Amino acid sequence: EAVQAVARAIRRTRAGLKDPKRPAGTFIFAGPSGVGKTELSKALAEFLFGDDDALITVDMGEYHDSYQVSRLFGSAPGYVGYEEGGQLTEKVRRRPFSVVLFDEIEKAHERVYDSLMQVLDEGRMTDGQGREVDFRNTVIIFTSNIGTQDISKPVGMGFQDSKNANESNYQRMQNKVREGMKKHFRPEFLNRIDDVIVFRQLTEDEILPVSYTHLRAHETRED
């Protein structure tokens, strides 16, 4: 479902059906750790821009206090760090064709959302040095663990085959994620997101080929 949802949004962009002033795509990838949110983001960067280095990752846990927000977008004149520029805006300015991954967005201070609203609305942002940074060619992805804390708990009673149990767990997780997001994020933020994608937990049959792929990649690097 995640791959299909992203593919639909990218096709709309390439067909010219999106607002040209906004980023190429904006998504929330929700789900517990280890379900492939970051891996899909890397694959998307490589597919769209030919290089997985086109993925710009921002750990939002580093911006949970108000005084840290200026590091992301650049300090105002006269403040410490003014000459360095923002850690996000500088990277996007140098690489405007990229996937920008805001990891665990729920950990960020509310001032981050205020600043990002301009990006989601207008596809641009003015950094601390007064330079306009263009986000219109970026795909923006927010990851979140909201609502996934207790999804491993079994649901239902009696006999239930694994397929039905997995589907029941997934539906329960979707509901919890969407309820949690409505409580945590402001409506004006959620309304500017193209799609909220809830990742399924990986089954054993899915984990094995993923592990094999990572081992092969490690062997290739060693060679």
Residue ranges of model-derived segments:
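AAA+ P-loop NTPase nucleotide-binding core of proteostasis motors
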Residues: E1-R216, R221
